[in-house]
C-alpha cells in the first residue's frame, strides 16, 4: 500500500459512526492540554474541508487556540472560487481563526524509503530513488495558482532532490511560505531558503525517528 492509498483510507475514518462527537471531545481535551503547555496556536493541515470545518468548530465554542486552516491543492480552486485568501479571518472565530496556506506533499518519507533523493537508497533492489507525489510541473502550476490568488504555500519536502525541485518552483513562481520538514538538503540549497524568503518548518522529533534510517538506507 502506497502513501496516497493510505491517505485515502485515513480520510474515511472521520466518517465512521459516532466519529464526529468523539472528535469534538478529543479536540477539546487537546486544546486544554496544549494551552496548559503554553501552546497558543496550531496549523491544521488535515486532509479535509478545513475552512468550513473550523468555522463550524468555532461556532460550537471550540475556541481555546489560534488556528490556521490550511487547504490541499485539490481544494485550492474551490477556495479561490469561494473568495478566500491566506490570512482571511474565519467568521465567528473572533480573530482566533484564519485561512492558512496551501499544503502540498511533494514526496514521501525516509522510513518508507519514499522521500525523493538524488542518489538511490542503499541495499534495496530494484534500485529506487523514492517517489514524487506530483510531477515538478504540477508543483509549479499549483504554486503559481496559489500565488496569483493570494495563498501562501507550505510544501512538504524531505528528500534532497524533492527539496531542490520545490526550491526551483518557488524561485520561478515567487511563492511565499515554508518548506515543511526540509529534512535533507544539498549544501548548495541551504542558503536558497533564506534567499527565497522561505521558512524551514522543522520538527525535531524527526531527527530521532530517522537518524538510524538515514545511516542504513540513504545513498552514500
Task: Describe every region a protein language model picked out.
Residues 54-58, 79-85, 163-174:
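Distinct, well-ordered alpha-helical segments
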Residues 59-66, 87-95, 146-149, 171-177, ...:
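Secondary-structure transition/capping motifs at alpha-helix termini
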Residues 1-70, 93-147:
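Catalytic pocket of metal/acid-base enzymes, prominently hydrolases
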Residues 110-113, 151-160, 202-204:
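Short acidic/histidine-rich active-site segments
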Residues 40-44, 152-157, 177-180:
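Short catalytic-loop micro-motif centered on adjacent basic/acidic residues
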Residues 42, 48-51, 158-164, 184-187, ...:
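Active-site environment of divalent metal-dependent phosphoester hydrolases
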Residues 130-172:
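Long hydrophobic segments that form regular secondary structure
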Residues 184-220:
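Active-site-adjacent C-terminal substructures of enzyme catalytic domains
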